[in-house]
Amino acid sequence: MEMLQGLLLWLLLGVAGVWASRGPLRPLCQPINATLAAEKEACPVCITFTTSICAGYCLSMKRVLPVILPPMPQRVCTYHELRFASVRLPGCPPGVDPMVSFPVALSCHCGPCRLSSTDCGGPRTQPLACDHPPLPDILFL
């Protein structure tokens, strides 16, 4: 009887572990709110703003025999639908365009990394690092 109880406990914990690993521990690819920074060399300020970006988990695979078969392309969380918004940097000298444009995620999907439109690297240690003093946060959603 104890062996049966142990087996049942092992099964329940195993199923719970699988269920938990697919839940909130790995959020799927989706738009999330993020604070970004914008500045230009000629303008004296840095503006932080909140917008929606694509982030989250995409299923990836690696071949067991990479020597025989070519590598599998890894999919990343990237924009499916987007629009562009702009912020105006105050205090820019005449002749310097004060506008900075950025994408706003409307929907996301897992797809190939296109370096022309996607930052395929990992998380940044200092995503809001600016050379100029920051102004208060602006919200763009």
UniProtKB/Swiss-Prot annotation:
Keywords: Disulfide bond, Glycoprotein, Hormone, Secreted, Signal. GO terms for molecular function: hormone activity. Disulfide bonds join C29-C77, C43-C92, C46-C130, C54-C108, C58-C110, C113-C120. Residues 1-20 form the signal peptide. It is found in: Secreted. InterPro entries: Cystine-knot_cytokine, Glyco_hormone_CN, Gonadotropin_bsu, Gonadotropin_bsu_CS. The keyword Disulfide bond applies. Its main location: secreted. Glycans are attached at N33. One of its GO terms (biological process) is estradiol secretion. The modification Blocked amino end (Ser) is found at S21. One of its GO terms (cellular component) is cytoplasm. Heterodimer of a common alpha chain and a unique beta chain which confers biological specificity to thyrotropin, lutropin, follitropin and gonadotropin. The beta chain can also be formed by LH beta 1, LH beta 2 and LH beta 3. Promotes spermatogenesis and ovulation by stimulating the testes and ovaries to synthesize steroids. The LH alpha 3/LH beta 3 heterodimer was shown to have potent renotropic and weak gonadotropic activity. Belongs to the glycoprotein hormones subunit beta family. This is Lutropin subunit beta.
